[in-house]
From Swiss-Prot:
Residues 164-177, 513-523 have a biased composition (Polar residues). Residues 149-194, 323-344, 508-529 are annotated as: Disordered. Signal peptide: none annotated. The gene is RTC5. It comes from Arthroderma otae (strain ATCC MYA-4605 / CBS 113480). This is Restriction of telomere capping protein 5.
């Protein structure tokens, strides 16, 4: 009781503007290093516009500094002009935690501090809860939750924003620039998660939770507002292009080298992703429930590129140049051309290691798409940010369409891998229709027999679970079941057989002499999804289920990608897509840096204990060298036996008894 009274007295008479300023100062002192804060201040002050006593950035300044398209239509029809969308987001986030009152905010230094902290996930140093609420905050910034067109600008800012200032056009013009559905009713029935946990945590840290709790109480508008597909499409285009971005890289390099082919690939990728949000008429936009569920379940890392983008604000070229001048190590011409940020040529994805085959499937857009949902390490799951590199293991276009070639290249790879398959859907009559791209993430080595798949797997980290997914024409993700260790031995993660082909997530029947050539020996679907590729590598069956039509399997149902989370079906539903295969590629995952000292992975380059070869590529090459030596040894034995027919038969019999050749060979 006494604590509540103390809280009230502390916040009594304090306005939201003052509390917002206090929070910004707390963020600045606890979430940035002194050097980062000095760089941020230099960047802001060197470009800030001024009206009276207010220093601020407008949309043009922010877009120019970040190096993102600002609506000038340079990139085709403007679907990559994300500057207005980004400024719309920051003018909402800058009002945190008083979005309902202060949004849209003027982008002052305080507002910019809060924007950077929220978009780079640094708020954990100040706010001890509200982690899950970031999605709600991002939805609000896109859906314009809390903005009121009639809301006057605060008195201390209205005088400093005449009608012809860029700042006014950068905030108010955007309100009418995007189609946002407004609430159709004002139901007062509250849900359990109506509280904005992140805003509550901010108020709690300011000892003002009781006084200002009513301001951040999320009303029904957050659940009834919608993000227009046009708004989200522009943001997605930016995220796809900048997915490989690192903090020390210039964003302009990613845009300057875009051509029509890469733009078209990015558009296709964005359209495929948008299908997972499309549960009705696109004119109505994306609701909060759909947005939150799809992001959480199938696109958890989609906003990761915003972190390095806004961390650019923490590096000032001016301060770097001043250091060079003070040290006297650079000439005036060097100072003019010097830039602390490195360049990257995004035309060839740097994630692929040299020496790999020329991919028929992988491009920058596909890699970006994979990075939005596929965890490959811990604690940094994003494959474009955690040092992951891809090594070409198998390509049907390069190595041939045969199980022998697949076996030679894939079964000798003992590290995690990603398999990608492209082809065309086949209708019931067998005719090819639209193209499709599917794939699977296998977090451990492939096995040729199902018996080895019954071993216990360490599932302490998300990246140790398998994934089955569809990239086009729809975005569908089926995550591996956390209870995979409790599954029966006839439900392996992967299975390889010359009789049935390649099976992922299928139920494998027991082998019998009478069923070797019958359908009873064929793998069958299980769980939420499975993939079966025939021995000729020509056709595939991609199976998806809501989990009620089959027994538990390796993969969970696809979730929001195929059904609404609030209206889960109680009846069995499944779909089998028949595919005519064009290309199959398997890419091995190699970690070029040590991600975690506590990682249980055996495939790190740092794992050299007991003389183990530390690199999966080297281990595979060593295995091939061993096979080559054994083949040479068998050839020499054959030649030494003699050339006669009877002698040749005798020599062959000796080799079979030794287990070197024949059906019981150890080297097959």
């Amino acid at each position: 009781m006494g604590a509540g009274q103390s809280t009230d007295s502390k916040a009594l008479g304090t306005s939201p503007e003052e509390m917002s300023h206090i929070l910004a100062r707390r963020f600045a002192s606890k979430c940035f290093t002194p050097l980062e804060l000095a760089h941020l201040k230099d960047n802001f002050n060197s470009l800030a516009l001024k009206q009276g006593d207010i220093r601020y950035w407008n949309e043009e300044v922010l877009s120019r500094f970040l190096g993102i398209p600002d609506g000038n239509g340079k990139f085709g029809d403007g679907d990559l002009d994300a500057g207005p969308v980004i400024f719309r987001m920051v003018s909402y986030l800058g009002a945190f935690p008083f979005q309902n009152t202060l949004a849209p905010s003027v982008l002052t230094f305080d507002a910019l501090v809060k924007v950077i902290v929220l978009l780079t996930d640094r708020y954990g140093k100040v706010l001890r809860r509200g982690k899950k609420d970031r999605i709600k905050l991002l939805f609000g910034s896109l859906a314009d939750v809390g903005r009121k067109e009639e809301l006057p600008v605060p008195d201390n800012e209205s005088k400093d924003k005449p009608d012809n200032t860029p700042n006014k056009s950068g905030t108010q013009s955007q309100t009418a620039g995007f189609s946002i559905d407004k609430p159709s009713n004002d139901n007062d029935d509250e849900e359990d998660n109506d509280d904005d946990d992140l805003a509550l945590a901010a108020l709690e840290s300011l000892d003002a939770i009781e006084v200002f709790k009513h301001d951040q109480r999320i009303d029904r508008t957050v659940y009834e507002a919608h993000v227009s597909f046009d708004t989200f499409q522009r943001l997605l285009m930016l995220l796809v292009v900048l997915a490989p971005l690192r903090t020390n890289e210039e964003t302009s390099q990613y845009f300057s080298q875009l051509n029509e082919d890469s733009m078209e690939a990015a558009r296709r990728c964005v359209e495929n992703i948008l299908t997972s949000f499309d549960i009705g008429d696109r004119k109505s936009g994306i609701g909060y429930e759909t947005f939150s569920w799809v992001i959480s379940s199938s696109l958890p890392y989609i906003f990761d590129p915003l972190t390095p983008l806004f961390e650019h604000l923490l590096f000032s070229k001016n301060l770097d140049l001043s250091r060079r001048r003070d040290s006297g190590t650079s000439s005036p011409s060097e100072e003019k051309n010097a830039a602390p940020l490195s360049s990257l040529t995004p035309s060839k994805p740097s994630i692929t290691l040299s020496g790999s085959f020329e991919s028929c499937i992988l491009d920058s857009a596909i890699i970006s798409h994979l990075s939005f949902f596929l965890p490959t390490s811990s604690p940094i799951p994003n494959l474009l940010q955690n040092g992951t590199r891809l090594h070409g293991v198998f390509s049907s276009d390069t190595h041939g369409e045969s199980l022998t070639s697949f076996s030679h290249n894939v079964l000798t790879w003992d590290a995690p891998s990603i398999m990608l398959v492209t082809g065309a859907k086949k209708d019931p009559s067998g005719d090819e229709t639209e193209s499709i791209t599917i794939g699977a993430y296998i977090p451990r080595a492939w096995k040729s027999s199902t018996s080895a798949s019954a071993s216990h797997h360490d599932l302490s980290n998300q990246f140790q679970l398998p994934y089955l997914f569809q990239l086009s024409p729809n975005h569908v993700v089926m995550q591996g079941s956390p209870s995979i260790n409790s599954l029966k031995a006839n439900r392996p993660m992967v299975s390889f057989s010359t009789k049935s082909g390649i099976a992922i997530g299928c139920k494998i029947p027991p082998p019998t002499r009478t069923s070797l050539s019958s359908d009873s020996s064929r793998p069958t679907p299980a769980g939420g999804g499975s993939l079966l590729i025939d021995p000729a590598l020509e056709n595939a069956e991609f199976f998806m289920s809501n989990g009620l039509s089959h027994e538990e399997g390796v993969f969970l149902p696809a979730g929001a990608a195929t059904w609404s989370p609030s209206h889960s079906s109680s009846t069995a539903a499944s779909e089998t897509i028949h595919i005519s295969i064009y290309n199959i590629e398997v890419w091995g995952i190699v970690h070029t840096v040590t991600i975690s000292k506590h990682s249980s992975s055996k495939h790190s380059r740092s794992s050299t204990a007991n003389g183990a070869i530390p690199d999966a590529i080297m281990r595979q090459q060593a295995h091939w060298n061993f096979e080559a030596r054994e083949a040479e040894r068998r050839r020499e034995i054959h030649l030494n036996v003699g050339g006669g027919d009877s002698e040749e038969q005798t020599g062959r019999a000796l080799l079979e008894m030794a287990g070197i050749i024949g059906s019981s060979s150890r080297y097959r």
